[in-house]
Regions:
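N-terminal flexible/basic segments that precede or flank functional cores
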Residues: 1-42
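Residue-level detection of the helix-turn-helix DNA-binding "recognition helix"
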Residues: 68-69
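Intrinsically disordered, low-complexity and often Lys/Arg-enriched segments
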Residues: 1-2, 92-96
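Long, contiguous binding/interaction regions
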Residues: 29, 57, 76, 95-96
Length: 96
């Protein structure tokens, strides 16, 4: 008898601002811009890509492209997306 599995979607588990912040903090530990762009896309899907697009004044398609592993969001896009998600960028000394 074969084991039946289904794809894991991180977006389904990002229900609270605390979960989202912890997820993005973990992604930032890898220091990988492509992974961060992808993770922001996952969070946008969890919160509703259409709503994030509307708040940022960008199309859903543009956000799907920008917030992917191949995307490279500009700083103004990054800041707008974070604001629409109810998040902000914070700077800390390395090792803090």
């Amino acid at each position: 008898m074969a084991l039946e599995t289904r794809p894991y979607d991180t977006a389904e588990h990002l229900k609270t601002p605390e979960h989202i912040a912890a997820y993005l903090d973990a992604v930032l530990e890898d220091n990988d811009p492509a992974l961060l762009a992808h993770a922001l896309g996952v969070v946008a899907r969890a919160q509703g890509m259409a709503e994030i697009a509307q708040e940022t004044g960008r199309s859903r398609e543009q956000l799907y492209r920008t917030l992917s592993e191949k995307g490279n969001p500009q700083l103004d896009t990054l800041m707008g997306v974070l604001k629409a998600m109810g998040l902000r960028l914070s700077i800390q000394p390395v090792g803090a």
